[in-house]
Amino acid sequence: MSSKAQSKEKFKSKIGGQAVIEGVMMRGIDKAAMACRLPDGTIDLEEWAIKGGKDTPWYRKTPFVRGIFSFLTSLIDGYKCLTRSAEKQMTEDDEEEQTKFEQWLDDKLGDKLGPIITAISMVLGVGLAILLFMYLPSLVSKFISKFVHLSAFGKNLIEGILKIAIFIGYTALTALTKDIRRTYEYHGAEHKTIACYEHEEELTVENVKKYTRFHPRCGTSFIFLVLFISIFVNTIFRVSWANIFLRVVIKIALLPIVTGIAYELIRLAGKYDNIFTKIISAPGLWIQRITTSEPDESQIECAIAALKACIPENKEDDKW
C-alpha cells in the first residue's frame, strides 16, 4: 500500500473536547470526562456516561440533522462543565467570604441557586451573541448600503465579513486576560493530546508535546464555518433587509440549516486530508493561533487524564 493511501486511512478518533477552567473536558462515544487541576495541585477527574455507540438515536446519526443536535449538546454540556470547573477552583476561604446578598440567595434557593444562575448566564450569553453576530452586523451592513449600491449578496457578504471580524477581534481581546489565556493553553493541550492518540502513540507528556496544537475538528473552525456559510444561506433564502429585527428572527430560524452544513464540513475535514478539506480548514486553523496556546506539562497531564477516561474498551468503536 502506498504511503499516500496509508495517510488517508490513518486512525481518526470520535473523541472531542473543550478547555474548561483549569482543565479539559473530553467526550467519547459512550462516556465523557473532565479533569481539572485543583488549587492544591492535584487532578480532579469526573466521569459520566452518555448515550452513544449502538444507543445513539437516529437524529444523532442522520447527516445534516445530527449537526444541529451535536451543536446544542456541545453548547449545553460545555457551559455546565465550565460552571462546574469554576466551582472546583473555589477554596474554603472563598466560600466563607460570601456577601450578605449571596448568603441570602443561598438560604432562600439552596440547591436551586446553581441551575438558576446557569440558566440566566446562558440566556445572557445567547442574547449577547445574537446582538454581536446577528443584529449589529445587519445594522451596519444596511447603513453602508444607504451610501453604496449593493446587491443582496453584497450586503450579505459585508455582513458576513463583519461577523468574522467581530469573532476574531473578540477572541483576540479575550486572549489578553490571564485567565482566558490559561484556558487557551488548556485548549492547546486538548488538541495535542487528541493528535497523539490519533497517531496511536502512548499518551505520555513527552509524546503529547511533539504534536501540533492545531486541529481541523475544532469548535473554533466550526464557528468560522457557521459564520461563512450563513452568507450564502441568507442570500439563497433571500432574508429580508426591510426590518432588521425580523431579519434576525429569520436568521435564527435558518441557524439549524447553517449548523447542519458546517458540521458535515467539519466531519469531512476531520476525516480526510485533501485539497478541499485543506481549503475549508485553513481559516479555522489560522484562528486557532489565537484560541490555542502551547500548554505546560501540568496542563497536558489534565488533558491526558480526561482522554484516557473516554477511550472505549473496543478501540474499533472509536473509529471516525
What are the roles of these predicted feature ranges?
Residues 1-97:
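Divalent-cation
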